[in-house]
């Protein structure tokens, strides 16, 4: 019986069954490979989608991050520009500070010279006003201010002009020769009211 079974030929149905059983086993690895490819492709697509987004996010984050190299360079440049501006301002301050003592000294010298000129002018005026009462005939009771002294000098000049232009110049020339007599005549002329009238004008 064993010889019959071993020697019996295999039927085509059994071959087809065995082949059909082997074919699914052979076909399974390709399906697994395809699934792996799909999974890999899906992972790649997901990674690629995340990649640009991550790159974009990284780009934005890199722009916002203070420690990025680009911003560090910009910060250094701005700091350098600010330092240069500060240096320029410092230089301007030093130049102005160097020029300020000269201008201050010039102003001081100008003020001193102006004060000297004002003192000289005041001194000369005081000397002139002190000399006028010696020339103009005055009364012992006169306590004249500078303006009154000037008015009295103007009236004395007017009196002398009237004396010189009078019709009786020849007959009265001898009586007005001496300075004392002129002074007396002027004093009388003042007391008669001419001085008060001229002072009122």
UniProtKB/Swiss-Prot annotation:
Localization per record: Nucleus
Keyword Repressor recorded: yes
Keyword presence, DNA-binding: yes
Keywords, ordered alphabetically: Activator, Biological rhythms, Developmental protein, Differentiation, DNA-binding, Myogenesis, Nucleus, Repressor, Transcription, Transcription regulation
SUPFAM superfamilies: HLH, helix-loop-helix DNA-binding domain
Composition skew (Basic residues), residue ranges: 34-43
Record domain bHLH: where: 109-160
Protein name stated in the entry: Twist-related protein 1
PROSITE patterns referenced in this protein's UniProt entry, alphabetically: BHLH (PS50888)
GO biological process: cell differentiation; developmental process; muscle organ development; negative regulation of DNA-templated transcription; regulation of transcription by RNA polymerase II; rhythmic process
Biased amino acid composition, Low complexity: 1-18
Protein role: Acts as a transcriptional regulator. Inhibits myogenesis by sequestrating E proteins, inhibiting trans-activation by MEF2, and inhibiting DNA-binding by MYOD1 through physical interaction. This interaction probably involves the basic domains of both proteins. Also represses expression of pro-inflammatory cytokines such as TNFA and IL1B. Regulates cranial suture patterning and fusion. Activates transcription as a heterodimer with E proteins. Regulates gene expression differentially, depending on dimer composition.
GO cellular component, one term: nucleus
């Amino acid at each position: 019986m064993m010889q019959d079974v071993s020697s019996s030929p295999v039927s085509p149905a059994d071959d087809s069954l065995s082949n059909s059983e082997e074919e699914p086993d052979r076909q399974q690895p390709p399906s697994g490979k395809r699934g792996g490819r799909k999974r890999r492709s899906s992972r790649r697509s997901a990674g690629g989608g995340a990649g640009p987004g991550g790159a974009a996010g990284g780009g934005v984050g890199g722009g916002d991050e203070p420690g990025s190299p680009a911003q560090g360079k910009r910060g250094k440049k701005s700091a350098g520009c600010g330092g240069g501006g500060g240096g320029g301002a410092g230089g301007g301050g030093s130049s102005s500070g160097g020029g300020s003592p000269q201008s201050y000294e010039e102003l001081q010298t100008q003020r001193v010279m102006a004060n000297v000129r004002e003192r000289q002018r005041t001194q000369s005026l005081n000397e002139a006003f002190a000399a006028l009462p010696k020339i103009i005939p005055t009364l012992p009771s006169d306590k004249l201010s500078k303006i009154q002294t000037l008015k009295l000098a103007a009236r004395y000049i007017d009196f002398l002009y009237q004396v010189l232009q009078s019709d009786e110049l020849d007959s009265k020339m001898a009586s007005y020769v001496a300075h004392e007599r002129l002074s007396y005549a002027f004093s009388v002329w003042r007391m008669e009211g001419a001085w008060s009238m001229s002072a009122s004008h």
